[in-house]
């Protein structure tokens, strides 16, 4: 019987973390956790009620997130998944991710979930060093900002969502700066994490490289 492990994938926005993590989870029949969608859910709540950051923190006690998968995310019993890819929500999610109370709120939900069993693919910032530091496979996936912007434009076009390359590139650069320089858990390659730069790799090539590392880890169990 194959033994399950945990896999954590970290990295900047738009690098393909979600796509790769979902593909791995499907292939291995694991549970996929996209941590960024938790922040987007909180950002959606903030935007919906036009809250300041201080009021948002006070409202956390009234927020219940039920994460089924990336296509079903319930916020106080409302499925909000279709709204979470909006660029405005994405920008606000990055802003509120610097708030310690919000990070702790979301982190605890995820940590409690992963205590139950092995067999998770968790994707998002902080995953490799805070949420899943003991994961058997920890990856930091990276790519240049122009490459990531072009990928985002392509992704949006496939979803029939209009987008502007220059605006997306500017947003990515601003988000990178914010994520790498924030006081709370800045984006970085943690000790023992395998860094993979996939500028010149497509999704399938990136998937196969990481799957090879996963199979090696499973064989060692």
Swiss-Prot record:
Any one GO molecular function term: CMP kinase activity
Swiss-Prot/TrEMBL catalytic activity: CMP + ATP = CDP + ADP; dCMP + ATP = dCDP + ADP
Compartments it resides in: Cytoplasm
BP GO annotations: pyrimidine nucleotide metabolic process
InterPro entries: AAA+_ATPase, Cytidylate_kin, Cytidylate_kinase_dom, P-loop_NTPase
EC number(s) per entry: 2.7.4.25
Signal peptide range: none
Main subcellular location of this protein, as a coarse class: cytoplasm
Keyword Transcription regulation on entry: no
Domain of life: Bacteria
UniProt keyword list: ATP-binding, Cytoplasm, Kinase, Nucleotide-binding, Transferase
Keyword Membrane: no
Gene Ontology CC annotations of this record: cytoplasm
Gene3D superfamilies in alphabetical order: P-loop containing nucleotide triphosphate hydrolases
Binding site for ATP: 11-19
Family designation: Belongs to the cytidylate kinase family. Type 1 subfamily.
HAMAP family (alphabetical): Cytidyl_kinase_type1
Protein name (Swiss-Prot/TrEMBL): Cytidylate kinase
Organism for this UniProt entry: Mycoplasmopsis pulmonis (strain UAB CTIP)
């Amino acid at each position: 019987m194959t033994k399950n492990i945990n896999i954590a994938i970290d990295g900047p926005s738009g690098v393909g973390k979600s796509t790769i993590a979902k593909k791995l989870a499907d292939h291995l029949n694991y549970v996929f956790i996209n941590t960024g969608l938790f922040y987007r859910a909180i950002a959606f709540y903030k935007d919906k009620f036009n809250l300041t950051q201080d009021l948002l923190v006070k409202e956390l006690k009234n927020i219940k997130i039920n994460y089924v998968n990336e296509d079903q995310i319930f916020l106080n019993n409302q499925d909000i998944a279709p709204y979470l890819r909006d660029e405005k929500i994405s920008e606000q999610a990055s802003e509120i991710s610097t708030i310690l109370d919000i990070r702790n709120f979301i982190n605890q939900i995820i940590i409690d979930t992963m205590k139950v069993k092995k067999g998770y693919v968790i994707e998002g910032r902080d995953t490799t060093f805070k949420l899943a530091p003991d994961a058997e496979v920890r990856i930091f996936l990276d790519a240049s900002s122009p490459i990531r912007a072009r990928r985002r434009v392509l992704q949006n076009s496939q979803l029939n969502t209009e987008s502007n390359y220059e605006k997306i590139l500017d947003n990515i650069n601003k988000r990178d700066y914010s994520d790498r320089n924030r006081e709370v858990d800045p984006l970085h390659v943690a000790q023992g994490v395998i860094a993979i730069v996939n500028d010149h790799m497509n999704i399938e090539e990136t998937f196969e490289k990481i799957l090879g590392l996963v199979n090696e880890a499973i064989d060692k169990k």
